[in-house]
A protein has these predicted regions:
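Feature captures the catalytic cores and cofactor-binding loops of soluble hydro-lyases/lyases
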Residues: 144-178
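Protease-associated
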Residues: 123-158
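Intrinsically disordered, low-complexity regions enriched in acidic/Ser/Thr/Pro/Gln residues
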Residues: 1-126, 130-131, 137-138
Length: 178
């Protein structure tokens, strides 16, 4: 799937092909190319060409982001662009955050028993976004980072506040996913 932001080609991703709009939006959000509150005027997908175009109402700073690349710890030696790493130190988990191990056990059980592509075919990673013990959305893809991006795209599209949310993934977290 080749992703364009306005008229600029950004990246080509290997994916299972479902939810191309959410994958595109999430990738752009996670690369700080789209920010919460930015206006997306259209997301156009051409299945035959394997292309998704995200159109925004503002000029993007894609060229500036391309000047600064960071090689990541993922198996495929991925790359993140621009100021993504710079924001790490500003992210803090509130001291009153609670996470119950029983929630993790229930999530693992649900992921391993719910009908999914993983149960049918294997070799698929899944991510679930929860509020407390309640799952909100579950996404799968051949790449862990793609499943993460789909969840981020879903959150962006549905204007979901990340406060009080828990994120669970079936695979290890690489630096770009964090």
């Amino acid at each position: 799937l080749t992703l364009y932001l306005n008229a600029q080609e950004v990246v080509t991703m290997m994916t299972i092909g479902d939810q191309p709009d959410l994958l595109a939006l999430g990738y752009l959000v996670n690369q700080n190319m789209l920010k919460i509150g930015d206006e997306v005027t259209a997301v156009d997908y051409d299945e035959d060409l394997g292309v998704v175009v995200v159109r925004t109402g503002h000029k993007t700073n894609f060229e500036e982001k391309m000047k600064k690349k960071v090689r990541t710890s993922g198996c495929a030696q991925g790359t993140i662009f621009g100021d993504v790493i710079d924001a790490f130190e500003t992210i803090k988990l509130p001291s009153n955050t609670k996470l119950k191990t029983s929630w993790l056990y229930e999530l693992t059980k649900a992921i391993n028993t719910e009908p999914s592509l993983y149960l049918k075919a294997g070799a698929i990673h899944g991510c679930v976004l929860c509020e407390g013990e309640q799952p909100l959305v579950y996404m799968e893809d051949v790449g862990r980072h793609n499943a993460v991006d789909k969840v981020a795209g879903w959150m962006f599209q549905n204007k979901i506040d990340p406060s009080n949310k828990m994120f669970y993934t079936t695979g290890r977290l690489t630096s770009e996913m964090v």
